[in-house]
Every structure is written in structure tokens, then in C-alpha cells.
Amino acid sequence: VRRTKSESEETRQRILDAAETVFLDIGVSRASLDRIATEAGVTRGAIYWHFANKQELFAAMIERVHGQHEAVVASSFLNGSDPLDGILKWALKVIELFVAEAHTRQVYRIVVTRCEYVGEMQHALEWQCDLHDRMAVNMRNAFEAAAAAGQLAPDWTVKSAATTLECFMSGMLDNWLRYDFDAEVAETLRAGLRSLVGSFRARDCAAHPSAVQQGRALHA
């Protein structure tokens, strides 16, 4: 039985791999379960054993990469002594994931450039909105902690700071997935993030030296 479960999981992973290949090649809307089954070397019935439909398969493809990173990345926010440093480390860690992991870039490239979120894929957009909302809550909580600690500069509110950082990150990742940034551009983005997050900080509330060193160590 143990081997059967192992084989079942192996088949599931093979189907997900095949779905990524097909989605990237011809787009999500044109991809049929028959085409994915052929790519995976399985029957259409084998796909239905693991996934109810293409939408569920698409969601599982995203969750396979997002799920393994979400907790690690979100933990960067948990910096009680310096919430703004936690925000910076979170943003830098997101960049590192895109620099280091081609598979992560591939999946999110499908999400951004290979799918129309209408008709049968409307539910997938709602699922992505849920992921976004979870991230937004973490970010807002971190900025609220920064404000409560007296870290937030007077020109910024919790809402304006969180919205600005979110727009920076979303635009950065969208362009990265469309145009394949290189290491030099990634370093420019790191510098931009440090400047942006630095502007959030009140002048009389400097980052702790060890916190700055930790942020820089993320890309050393």
C-alpha cells in the first residue's frame, strides 16, 4: 500500500510537470486535459483521479511552488524589535527566490503571461486574490507594528506605505516575468528596495546595525 501511495504521488507530480510544460507552450486556455495527459504519459482518467478539472490542476500547480515558500517568506515579517527591517528582509527574500529558482519563475510566468482569467478560469483568479489578501494582511500588520513602534516617517501612513511597497513589488515581479531580468537588474532592484523602505523610516529611528547586515547578507 505504501508503494501504491508513493506511485500515486509520483503520478500526480508528473501530471503537474506536464501541465506546466503545456501551459507554458500553448497557454492555459488552449491546453486540454488530453494534451496534458499525453505529455505526462498517463490517461485522462489518471488526471481526473487527482484533479477534478483544469482549474484545480492550475491551482495545484501554483500551490506547489507558493506553498513551500509562503511560510518561509512570511516569517521575515516577524521582527518585533524592528518591523521595518522585517519588511525589507521579506522583500529581499522574494527577489532571492526569483533569482535562485527557475522553476518558481516558470510557474509565475504562466500565471502572469499565459492565462486569461475569464470563463472557466475565473475561479483561479479568485484563488489568487485570496493569496494576495494573505500577503497584504502580513504587510499591513508589519507596517502597523512599525507605526506603533514610532518607526514610520510622518510623510507615510500605514495604508500609503503598504500600498506603495505592494505596487513596487507587483510591478517589479510582473516585468521580471515578462522580460527576464538579469543579475545586474536584480541588484538594482535590491538597492531600490532599500531606498524605498529607508524612506518609510523616521529619521530619529535608525535601523539596528545587525538588522542592516542581515538584510545585505540575503544576497551575499
Model-found features: residue ranges?
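N-terminal intrinsically disordered/low-complexity leader segments
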Residues: 1-10, 204-220
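Key DNA-contact positions within bacterial/archaeal DNA-binding proteins
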Residues: 45
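Hydrophobic alpha-helical segments that form the core
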Residues: 110, 156-175, 187-196, 219
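Hydrophobic alpha-helical connector segments
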Residues: 60, 74-106, 158-165, 205-206, ...
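Basic, helix-initiating cap at the start of DNA-binding domains
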Residues: 1-26, 30-42, 56-59
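Base-recognition residues in the alpha-helical recognition helix of bacterial helix-turn-helix
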Residues: 24, 48-52, 60, 64
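Short secondary-structure transition hinges
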Residues: 96-141, 151
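Hydrophobic alpha-helical bundle segments that form small-molecule/ligand-binding pockets
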Residues: 78-80, 122, 132-161, 176, ...
